[in-house]
Regions:
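Conserved ATP/PPi-binding loop(s) of AMP-dependent carboxylate-activating enzymes
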Residues: 155-162, 172-206, 244-246
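Gly/Ser/Thr-rich phosphate-binding loop
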Residues: 66-71, 80-151, 164, 173
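AMP-binding/adenylate-forming catalytic core of the ANL superfamily
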Residues: 69, 188, 193-194, 204, ...
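Beta-strand->loop->alpha-helix junctions that form or flank phosphate-binding loops
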Residues: 120-127, 157-159, 268-271
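Short hydrophobic/charged patches on amphipathic alpha-helices used for structural packing
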Residues: 54-58, 85-87, 203, 252
Length: 285
């Protein structure tokens, strides 16, 4: 319920809003944002059983004048590539929010070009209900006519209301300064009580610091001076080569700069007799 209220404040829903509910409910993003959220807030929702059926999604948005859609980078890519989708089908959408995976820059750009709709990237985990932070539209301050910035390129936005983000050293859990990348701890009412009948795993995931109960996300990132959160990697996605820690995410970023977005790939680490580990790339296409 806490996360539902946080989502409501983010999108600032009104009586005329209609939620496109196409995400699977076995995923926390689909269950909380696309299912429980409209039910709890008394907002109309239009349901599509298969989010990969791009034309069915487009027809549902157009028929019921959906104004808010939650999706993933993978699904948004399908909509940009589908030739059956007329750009006017998404003309009523005022908020398209991406989560569950990193928003591909090309997908964000192509979706805006085709439909005229900006995709706002967010971040979350199942253990935090899941929404932790999100970019939203900038607004004009009515008294002094200054732009209030709520979105930053490359970031996953500002923490939701009542959410505490602590960036700390992965080993000592000492708090780090703004701009320094470290382990992301998440505090707030939306944090889970624990894993079902698994006290040992719960103790590993939940830590209390300075009177705040945090979830250890296992992700690496930093906060800037304005409070925007940027994800840089996952703690588990490092290879130790010859004693040096190599970020798999950084390797992937360099490969993406060369190959572009047409090749789907992922880097992983495997054992190596000489250097301990080595990085290998798995790809398709």
């Amino acid at each position: 319920m806490a996360n539902i209220k946080q989502i409501s404040e983010i999108v600032n829903t009104g009586g005329n809003d209609v939620i496109l509910a196409s995400l699977p409910i076995f995923h926390s993003f689909g269950l909380t944002a696309a299912t429980f959220f409209p039910l709890s807030e008394g907002i109309a929702s239009a349901h599509v059983a298969d989010p990969t059926d791009a034309f069915a999604v487009g027809k549902m948005v157009a028929k019921y004048h959906a104004t808010i859609m939650f999706g993933t980078s993978t699904f948004f890519r399908l909509y940009t590539k589908n030739k059956k989708l007329n750009p006017l089908m998404f003309s009523t959408i005022r908020y398209a929010i991406a989560g569950a995976e990193k928003l591909n820059a090309a997908v964000k750009r192509e979706f805006k070009m085709k439909f005229g709709v900006e995709i706002y990237e967010g971040y979350g985990t199942t253990e935090t209900s899941p929404v932790v932070s999100v970019n939203t539209a900038n607004v004009l301050e009515p008294e002094f006519f200054k732009e209030l910035v709520f979105s930053k390129e490359g970031s996953v936005g500002l923490p939701t209301a009542g959410t505490i983000i602590r960036i700390c050293d992965p080993t000592s859990l000492a708090k780090l300064e703004n701009g320094q990348a470290g382990l992301i701890l998440i505090g707030g009412h939306q944090v889970m009580k624990g894993y079902y009948e698994d006290e040992e795993r719960t103790k590993e995931a939940i830590v209390e610091l300075d009177g705040v109960r945090y979830y250890n996300s296992g992700d690496i990132g930093f906060l800037d001076e304005a409070g925007f959160l940027t994800i840089t990697d996952m703690l588990s996605r490092f290879a130790k080569i010859g004693g040096e820690m190599i970020s798999l995410g950084a390797v992937e970023a360099q490969i993406s700069a060369v190959l572009g977005d047409e090749v789907t790939f992922v880097c992983t680490n495997v054992a190596d007799e000489k250097k301990g580990e080595q990085v290998v790339m798995l790809f398709s296409g």
